[in-house]
Amino acid sequence: MEVPEIEKQIGINLYSTDTTGLGGQLRQEIEDFIVKEITNREEGEEGKYLIVELTKRDWDTHHLTRTLSRILQVSQKRISVAGTKDKRALTTQKISIFDTDASEIEKIHLKDIELKVLGRSRKSVELGDLWGNDFRITVRNIENSPEETEALLKKTTDEILAQGGVPNFFGIQRFGSVRPVTHLVGKAIVEGNFEKAALLYIAEPFPEEPEETKNARQFVKDTLDFKEGLKTYPLRLGHERAMMNHLIANPEDYSGSFRVLPQNLYRMFVHGYQSYIYNIILCRRIEAGIPLNRAVEGDIVCFRNEVGLPDSSKTEKVTSETVNAMNRLLKLGRAFITAPLPGYNTEFASGIPGEIENGVLKELGVSLEGFNIEKFPEMSSKGTRREVLLEVKPKFEAGEDELNPGKSKAVLEFMLPKGSYATTVLREYMKVNPLQMS
C-alpha cells in the first residue's frame, strides 16, 4: 500500500503489514489518547524531593511546569519530570519538586490537573527513571462495521506479532507534524551552510500551514527583508522572530542566529537529519528482505541494560561464528539488531547490512566529518545506533462509535519503551496521512 507523501519526505516509504488500513481519526476527544508513564522508582518518606503523581488533560508539559513554579513561588528548575508527554492527551506521570512541603500541593487548583502526593525521595525524578509508557488509544470515525473493524484489527495484529513488532521508525513528531523541516535544517548545518539552514527554518513555507503564515514566510524567502517580515510573522512563531531579530542586529551572522533558540530545539536539527537517514536505512533493509528480528553476518546488535531496555552503548558485531548464538539471544529478547544514527564517530555494520548503510550515505552524499560542527560544537554528534524493531504486543477491541453514528471505533492498548512513538504502531493499523494522527 502506498504511503502518504509526507512520510516519504521523512524517509519512510513502506508499511511492514499488508492489511487494508482502518482509516479513521485520533483524538476526537482528549480521552481518546491515554498515556501512563512506567518508571522504576519507589518512593519513601524522607528526602528533599517531594514526589507527586501528575495527571493532566490537554496541558503542555513545559507550560504546566511554568504554571506550577509560579503558584508555588519556586524556580522552575526545582520541578523535574522524566519525560515530556503529549499535550492533546490524558497523561499520568511522576514529577519531583525540590524542598517543598506536601501541604503546598493542596493549594493548587488548576482545571484538568490532578496532583497526588506519593512520598519523598533523596533523588529527583529524571529521564533515566523512565522505562516506557502504557497507551490506551481510541481510533474513531471508521467507515467499516464493528465486525469488519474487529477482523482488520486481528489481521494486522497477527502480522505484527508474527514479525516480532513493527519497524522502529522515527515518527513525524521528530521532524515537525505540520512542517517537517527539522531534518532539512540539520542537513544544511551538517553541510556547513548555516545561511541555508536559517532560511529554511525561518522562511520555508509548507502546504499545511495557515495561509497568512505561508505568505509571511514566502515574503521573507523572496526578499530576505527580516525587518519588514517581522511585521507579518504571527507572534506564535516566537523562535523564527527571535532569529530574525538577531539577523537584523547582526547581518549575515546565520550561525549565531541559532544561538537565540533553546538548546533542546537547536539540538533537534542534527538529530532530525540523523533520524531521516536512519529511517531510509531501515526501509532499505526491509526492501532487501533482511529480517528485523534475525541477525545476519555483519549486523551490529546491542544488549539489554540493567532495567531491561536496549542499550546502544553495549554493542557487538555478528560474525559467522557468533550468528547462531546471537539469534538465540535475539529470540530471548536479550539482544537487538541496530541501525546507525550517523555521526563523526559511528560504528557501521559490515556484510550486506553494511552495504545498505554505506550505500545510503553515499546516495545522500553524507560526509561524516560534517557532524563535527566547528561553528557550533554543541550541535555536533558522534552518532549512535538504535534498535530496528519496536517490540509491541497490542490488545484490541472494536465497537460502535458513540460520537459518530453509523461508524465504528477501535481501541488499542500497548506498552512501548521510552524513545519510541505510538504513531509508529498506529500507522500500521490506520494507514492514513500522519496529520490525521496528530
Swiss-Prot record:
UniProt xrefs under Pfam families: TruD
Broad enzyme group: isomerase
Active site: 86 (nucleophile)
A single GO BP: tRNA pseudouridine synthesis
Keyword vocabulary terms for this entry: Isomerase, tRNA processing
EC code(s) of this entry: 5.4.99.27
Catalytic activity field: uridine(13) in tRNA = pseudouridine(13) in tRNA
SUPFAM superfamilies given in the database record: Pseudouridine synthase
Highest taxon in the source lineage: Archaea
PROSITE patterns: TRUD, UPF0024
Alphabetized InterPro entries for the sequence: PsdUridine_synth_cat_dom_sf, PsdUridine_synth_TruD, PsdUridine_synth_TruD_CS, PsdUridine_synth_TruD_insert, TruD_catalytic
Statement: the UniProt record of this protein carries the keyword Isomerase: yes
Molecular-function GO terms, alphabetical: RNA binding; tRNA pseudouridine(13) synthase activity
Residues of the TRUD domain: 165-390
Family in the record: Belongs to the pseudouridine synthase TruD family.
Function comment: Could be responsible for synthesis of pseudouridine from uracil-13 in transfer RNAs.
UniProt xrefs under HAMAP family: TruD
Protein name from the UniProt record: Probable tRNA pseudouridine synthase D
Lineage: Archaea, Methanobacteriati, Methanobacteriota, Stenosarchaea group, Methanomicrobia
Gene: truD
